[in-house]
Regions:
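N-terminal export and membrane-targeting signals
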Residues: 1-8
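Extracytoplasmic surface signature
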Residues: 13-454, 630-650, 657, 663, ...
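Compositionally biased, intrinsically disordered or flexible polar/acidic segments
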Residues: 15, 450-628
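Well-ordered beta-strand scaffold positions
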Residues: 127, 469, 572, 670-671, ...
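Extracellular protease catalytic domains of secreted zymogens
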Residues: 316-335, 463, 487-498, 767
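A recurrent domain-boundary module in secreted/ectodomain proteins
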Residues: 421-441, 604, 609-626, 815-835
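Extracellular glycan/ECM-engagement signal in secreted proteins
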Residues: 776, 787-791, 796-800, 804-835
């Protein structure tokens, strides 16, 4: 999070319509630029590039530098804090004003060949110009008709033209003799005060009385493409008469600007590291449509919007609004920002992105993105584009999107890992880039089953990993079901879960086929409230074996007699004053087995004696059922189905995929995505029965950045997401609206995460979809045409409506194998790819 406060670039294209910082997709251009920077750009020899703008065919750059050089040349050309060059060739122009302070913002002037500059300077070419000036690009001299007079009494951070007005933001309290705290409007031609903007800012974000102190004012603002909305960020707690902390949305009316009373977020209230930062926001920009905007921030930590980019919807209404998505760096500042229709480009000194679970280190799901990143506009997940900047310096302060490509201004000389020398300014052209993949589903002509399963039999009725995630079975039987939901269909509420490192020991009571991982989590019952109770439906009259697994993992009860509790099954005591440590020693897994005859349900109850009862695993076995191993093949079958009529089944080419080890698949945009039991996702192009080569989706370990020093005591290596541990237990997988949905063995919930089809990156944190369907009965599933098709444990194919991320309506039977003879049981169910 360290680094100087900076403001990213402005781009102004004249008066009337607002100047644009966003780039709409030009006809024929790619969605994402090349990761190789153009070679023609000039070099900035020192300092920082703070602002970039395009004025006609000329690029204007502002910052803190004192000299530049032509591309490939070491000859020094003196340029004081601002210079210009040809946008197509990089040729440095004769524009060379002498500015006595930093230039923070640049924007096209009101007439061709003129440019506004703003910053901390007080003179240009030795002539008084308090923090704002309009210059001629031909000679660098001030345009004499623009007369700011006494100008601003504080730093100008942002200049923007819209609707025949010049909007100015910064840390000032007046313009000339007029009171303007943070925001002002001027006549763009004369510099006269325009009373249109009469919203004064007050207060500071860090109002604790200690820590960092910065001036009140606007750090950045942007105006929507239709000129109706302004998003402004900075160090303030009120704008006009409205309480707003660091972010406000302003309605730009015909005669005055007013703070929108229906748009308020409290998510920028957290102080984060206020010893280092007063305000934490850094840059704001609208999408080309004006329907949403993004804010970048510094500040430290992941419990808030600090060190993250956040998307907000312009038409949202409420007094406690939250972002649509948050893209975390995980402890590193994000500065520069450029927004296009397809992507959000981010500059800073970040080491990783997708790092919601990390703080100054790569958490699960983190991917290397040194100093530059592009994230998807709809989810905030990183795209594949990953040129990087190593070393990262303090940051990439200034990003600018044009129809030709993405400009990046920073304080470092290299793009890539010391690969392309582009001192402090680089250009990534759309030529040589790529288009984002389609996510359209195939038209439904048939359903394919990959990894045909001939069911075996198992005496196991239930297995539960108490308090933990799904644990794969070691014996071919059912997996140990996750116990992480509350309420649970087999347990009452009020208990807690805990997790531990792998258990060091298990005793001889534990069957060899039982995975020791079940002892790495527990469910324990605190005192007060109802005692912990479990209930498992079992046909009345059946004699079953109940196995209860225990381990004392908490160091707080490592001594004998420090934890004792009772256990009863169907109301009959089976363990009294049970002491795990006395029975099996500390940090050791043990098992107790009891034979009972069911009365329709097996009820297990726990009772307090000393400390809290706990259980690590529960297994219920019907010894009358023989163990017969299931068989799985790599065969793929296709059954004709158009959404209404089930036709014939044929065996089709499976592309050489090891389908027996898949755990779900889906087809979108001409690609087959599938999960394997090894914890990885894969992709192949597919057309009918023709498959491309297998590509492993492992963006968390980009070979370009593996084991490369990040300059902060570590490397850029990312970390696998926790989804990897779930994939072996998947029972179904499908894609919808930039998300993957999945079910896991023994779990009634429908899980989901955001997913990017370009990069293969998944969101680090999972969520759960509303559903009336019990997904513990699902063995495979796919989505097509708004219908979720799923195979139940009895082999029947059913469907149910699925829209807006939720199951709805009543399920209907599609096909009963007992009648039709079709086989739907397999590792993966997916819609047949179109040719």
């Amino acid at each position: 999070v360290a680094g100087a406060t900076a403001v990213a670039a402005t781009l102004a294209v004249g008066l009337g319509a607002p100047s644009l910082d966003t780039a709409q997709a030009a006809a024929g251009r790619n969605d994402v630029p090349s990761a190789v920077p153009a070679a023609f750009t000039p070099g900035v020899n020192n300092g920082q590039v703070r602002a970039i703008a395009q004025v006609g065919s000329t690029m204007v750059v502002g910052g803190t530098f004192s000299s530049v050089s032509a591309s490939g040349s070491t000859a020094v050309i003196n340029r004081t804090r601002v210079f210009a060059f040809d946008a197509g060739t990089g040729a440095i122009s004769s524009f060379a004003p002498n500015v006595n302070g930093n230039v923070e913002t640049v924007a096209a002037g009101p007439t061709a060949g003129t440019v506004y500059i703003g910053g901390s300077f007080t003179s240009v070419n030795g002539v008084k110009a308090p923090r704002i000036a309009l210059l001629s690009l031909s000679n660098g001299q001030a345009v004499t008709t623009f007369k700011p007079g006494a100008g601003f009494n504080g730093i100008v951070q942002r200049i923007r033209t819209s609707g025949g007005r010049l909007f100015v933001g910064g840390s000032f309290t007046k313009y000339q003799s007029f009171k303007h705290v943070g925001l002002a409007t001027l006549d763009p031609a004369t510099g006269n005060n325009d009373p249109y903007m009469n919203l004064n800012m007050a207060g500071r974000h860090n109002d604790t009385g200690s820590g960092r102190v910065e001036k009140t004012g606007a750090l950045d603002f942007d105006i929507s493409g239709d000129g109706s909305q302004m998003a402004v960020i900075g160090n303030f707690r009120t704008v006009g008469t409205e309480a707003r902390t660091q972010l406000a949305l302003v309605s730009l009316g015909a005669t005055s600007a007013t703070v929108r009373t229906d748009f308020k977020t409290n998510d920028y209230e957290p102080l984060c590291y206020n010893s280092a930062f007063d305000t934490t926001v850094r840059k704001v920009m609208f999408a080309p449509s004006g329907s949403w905007f993004v804010v970048t921030a510094t500040g430290g930590g992941n419990s808030s919007l600090c060190d993250a980019a956040s998307r907000f919807e312009t038409n949202a209404s409420g007094q406690d609004l939250h972002p649509t998505w948050i893209s975390h760096a995980g402890g590193d500042t994000l500065y520069g920002l450029a927004v296009t229709d397809e992507a959000v480009f981010l500059g800073g000194h970040q080491r990783w992105m997708n790092n919601q679970l990390g703080n100054d280190s790569p958490g699960p799901g983190a991917v290397p993105r040194p100093g530059l990143a592009a994230v998807a506009a709809d989810t905030g997940l990183p795209l594949s584009w990953n040129p990087g900047r190593n070393p990262r310096g303090a940051g990439a302060y200034s990003l600018l999107a044009t129809d030709a490509g993405i400009w990046v201004g920073s304080d470092t000389p290299w793009i890539g890992n010391h690969k392309y020398k582009r001192p402090r300014i680089a250009f990534f052209p759309y030529t040589g880039g790529y288009n984002l993949p389609s996510t359209a589903e195939p038209s439904l002509t048939g359903l394919r089953v990959g990894g045909q399963v001939s069911p075996g039999s198992s005496p196991v009725l239930y297995r539960v990993d108490a308090g933990g995630a799904t644990v794969a079975a070691n014996d071919g039987g059912p997996d140990w079901a996750a116990d992480q939901s509350d309420p649970s269909p087999v347990r009452n509420s009020g208990s807690n879960s805990a997790g531990y490192a792998p258990v060091p020991n298990v005793d001889s009571t534990v069957p060899a086929s039982t995975p020791s991982a079940i002892f790495d989590s527990e469910r324990w019952d605190p005192s007060g409230g109802d005692e912990m109770a479990w209930s498992f439906p079992v046909a009345a009259g059946h004699s079953v074996k109940v196995r209860l697994y225990f381990a004392n993992r908490c160091t707080c009860t490592s001594a004998e007699d420090s934890r004792q509790f009772n256990v009863a099954i169907d109301g009959n005591p089976v363990l009294s004053n049970f002491d795990i440590v006395k029975s099996a020693t500390d940090q050791t897994g043990t098992m107790r087995e009891f034979t009972v005859t069911s009365d329709g349900a097996v009820d297990i109850g726990f009772g307090h004696i000393t400390e809290n009862p706990l259980v690590n695993g529960i297994e219920i076995i019907d010894p009358s059922v023989p163990t017969v191993a299931a068989t799985v093949t790599d065969a793929v079958t296709q059954t004709a189905y158009d959404g209404s009529t089930v036709g014939a089944t044929t065996t089709v080419n499976g592309g050489g995929i090891d389908w027996s080890n898949t755990r779900g698949a889906f087809v979108i945009g001409g690609s087959l995505f599938y999960a394997k039991a090894n914890g990885l996702l894969y992709r192949r192009t597919v057309s009918g029965t023709t498959y491309g080569p297998e590509v492993v989706l492992n963006p968390y370990h980009d070979p370009l950045w593996m084991n490369i020093s990040n300059g902060s005591g570590g490397t850029y290596n990312g970390t696998d997401p926790n989804l990897a541990a779930q994939l072996p237990s998947l029972t179904g997988l499908f894609f919808d609206n930039s998300r993957i949905y999945y079910s896991t063995s023994g779990d009634p919930r429908l899980h989901y995460r955001s997913f990017n089809a370009d990069s293969g990156i998944v969101y680090p944190i999972e969520s759960f979809a509303p559903t009336s369907l019990d997904f513990s009965t699902v063995t495979s599933m796919t989505l097509n045409g708004g219908r979720l098709y799923y195979v139940r444990t009895d082999g029947q194919l059913w469907s149910v409506a699925f829209s807006n991320g939720a199951v709805s309506g009543t399920p209907s039977l599609v096909d009963n194998p007992a009648v039709s003879g079709h086989s739907w049981t397999g590792r993966s169910l997916f819609a047949a790819p179109n040719q």
